[in-house]
From Swiss-Prot:
This is Ribonuclease PH. InterPro entries: ExoRNase_PH_dom1, ExoRNase_PH_dom2, ExoRNase_PH_dom2_sf, PNPase/RNase_PH_dom_sf, Ribosomal_Su5_D2-typ_SF, RNase_PH, RNase_PH_bac-type, RNase_PH_CS. Homohexameric ring arranged as a trimer of dimers. Disulfide bonds: none annotated. It comes from Salinispora arenicola (strain CNS-205). It holds the Pfam family RNase_PH. One of its GO terms (biological process) is rRNA processing. It is an enzyme of class 2 (transferase). The gene is rph.
């Protein structure tokens, strides 16, 4: 069955990582996975949360949000609702966990980095695009710290592994890489996979949206995801070169 945008099952959407998109943050990246666009900024502050003080370790955390009209119908801002929704909180924590896997918190020292990932336009894969872009923004923030002699080591030693993420799923019985919204909405199986630049797993989230799935299907999806993440890692390397 043909995909909505004509891609082969194992092809990513066009990926673009534009560094320095915002003037003020220590690191900023506009990441595009096809029509999905996420602005990722990395803001550095000296010091760490109270519970972390005196440990010699840094801290990296994340916040995720969507613009009201990032989708085909407008959603109220969560600030107006007076609370952060469960989905938003879950994705924020996922991004934070994923990016902490990329950095040596001891080498970061008692500095904090907050990653803000704001979805400008959503067409599926917003959380995976956010993770992929946030890695590049975090790297630039660490480079900024190194230039101020606020780190014990070089940026490439502090950022000791790259991290990227991609969605995979079974749509119309076919394993597919990097689902857009139309595919995600009809997927029988849906996974979000976070990998390092060497293909090791950081996190795997998956559900059988329309029932159950086999071990063989899971293996096929993970193979697709690893290949996709390795391609994304190469895009990150090129963006940072």
């Amino acid at each position: 069955m043909a995909r909505p945008d004509g891609r082969l099952p194992d092809h990513l959407r066009p990926v673009t990582l534009t560094r320095g998109w915002s003037t003020h943050p220590e690191g900023s990246v506009l990441v595009e996975f096809g029509a999905t666009r996420v602005l990722c900024t990395a803001s550095v502050t000296e010091g760490v949360p109270r519970w972390r003080k005196g440990s010699g370790l840094g801290w990296v955390t994340a916040e995720y949000a969507m613009l009201p009209r990032a989708t085909n119908t407008r959603s109220d801002r969560e600030s107006v609702k007076g609370r952060v929704g469960g989905r938003t909180h879950e994705i924020s924590r996922l991004i934070g966990r994923s990016l902490r896997a990329s950095i040596d918190l001891k080498a970061l020292g008692e500095n904090s980095v907050v990653l803000d990932c704001d979805v400008l336009q959503a067409d599926g894969g917003t959380r995976t695009a956010a993770i992929t872009g946030a890695y590049v923004a975090l790297y630039d923030a660490v480079t900024w710290l190194a230039a101020r002699r606020s780190l014990a080591g070089r940026p490439e030693n502090v950022m000791h592994r790259s991290v990227a993420a991609v969605s995979v799923g079974v749509v119309a019985g076919e394993p597919r890489l990097d689902l857009n919204y139309d595919e995600d909405a009809t997927a029988e199986v849906d996974l979000n996979v976070v990998c390092t630049g060497t293909g090791d797993f950081v996190e795997v989230q998956g559900t059988g949206e329309a029932g159950v799935f086999s071990r063989g299907q899971l293996d096929a999806l993970l193979d697709l995801a690893v290949a996709g993440c390795l391609d994304l890692a190469e895009a990150q390397r090129k963006a940072l070169s």
